């Protein structure tokens, strides 16, 4: 399916204070871009969290006792029921900011990358095996560049 007009219902939950965040409109654009060739419509939640919540969730669901940039929780509908629910993304604002600084990237460009990256995970993409990683990174690069940002995997 090629669809440049994906309809997105975004539930944005901000569970952290005093951080610089992209606008809801930017996040919706990034989600629509990530989903444009996969879904006509989608509903998802993006929850912005602090380091403690990110670390707790990463430890609980991935067995890694440290905060991470983005976690993806796909929604799986019961068999025979089709719903536009894609799932949830949990993004740690502090980790995204520090990574942007460490990688010498504009903060919004890194936010865009993390949202696109998380959406691709919700669609079933992964980067555990090298071949999967190459496919996912190639698609991410195309999507991020279509948004006007630099290749996220090249040093800035």
UniProtKB/Swiss-Prot annotation:
Its EC number is 3.1.-.-. Binds 1 zinc ion. GO terms for cellular component: cytoplasm. The keyword rRNA processing applies. SUPFAM superfamilies: Metalloproteases ('zincins'), catalytic domain (SSF55486). GO terms for biological process: rRNA processing. One of its GO terms (molecular function) is RNA endonuclease activity. It is an enzyme of class 3 (hydrolase). It comes from the Bacteria. Single strand-specific metallo-endoribonuclease involved in late-stage 70S ribosome quality control and in maturation of the 3' terminus of the 16S rRNA. Belongs to the endoribonuclease YbeY family. This is Endoribonuclease YbeY. The lineage of its organism: Bacteria, Pseudomonadati, Pseudomonadota, Gammaproteobacteria, Alteromonadales.
């Amino acid at each position: 399916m090629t669809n440049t007009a994906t309809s997105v219902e975004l539930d944005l939950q901000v569970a952290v204070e005093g951080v610089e965040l992209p606008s809801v409109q930017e996040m919706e654009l990034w989600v629509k871009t990530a989903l444009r060739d996969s879904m006509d419509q989608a509903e998802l939640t993006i929850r912005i969290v602090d380091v403690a919540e990110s670390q707790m969730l990463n430890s609980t669901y991935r067995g890694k006792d440290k905060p991470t940039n983005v976690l993806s929780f796909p929604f799986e509908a019961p068999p025979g029921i089709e719903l536009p629910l894609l799932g949830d993304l949990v993004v740690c604002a502090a980790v995204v900011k520090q990574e942007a600084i460490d990688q010498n990237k504009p903060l919004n460009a890194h936010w865009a990358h993390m949202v696109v990256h998380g959406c691709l995970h919700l669609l079933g993409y992964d980067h555990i095996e090298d071949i999967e990683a190459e496919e996912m990174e190639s698609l991410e690069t195309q999507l991020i560049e279509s948004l006007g940002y630099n290749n996220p995997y090249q040093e800035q």
